[in-house]
Amino acid sequence: MEAGIGRGILYDREDVRDSEDVYAAYASMPVFLDREASHRYQLFCVRDDSMTDGTRDSLCIGDILLCREVFREDWTHGLIGRYPNVVVVTEEGILLRRLTKHDRKQETISLHSLNRGDEDRIIALQDVKAFFYVERLIERHLSQW
């Protein structure tokens, strides 16, 4: 399988609205999975310290993350799952955070930053353009530790 690197707040802003065009525009690299992949996967490169708290749970600047997209029609089933870290794409950019709550009645998600300097956020699902579970840390430079 090949997954591509996208753009957004985690990396340089791109004003392209069609996600298919955005995904096709950037480089990809082979990623080996231990199962057959039927979903769309995307690589994201961490560009800020919002998920860094000094623990082994940290996702550091420069880390490459393999993320699986959750399609909009599946959002009603509940987004809290076995992958706590998520990438959320909105009009304002892309956020890497920990998903702490999915309120299906209010149609919102609550996102938590590991960095104490960043505030938690509540985002309306109507404002979400794409939603990804962070499944795997693909690459980390040892200089981050």
Language model segments and positions:
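Residue-level recognition of conserved beta-strand edge/terminus positions
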Residues: C67-R68, V89
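Amphipathic alpha-helical interface segments
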Residues: K105-W145
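Short, hydrophobic/aromatic-rich segments at coil-to-beta transitions
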Residues: S38-L43, I80-V86, T108-S110
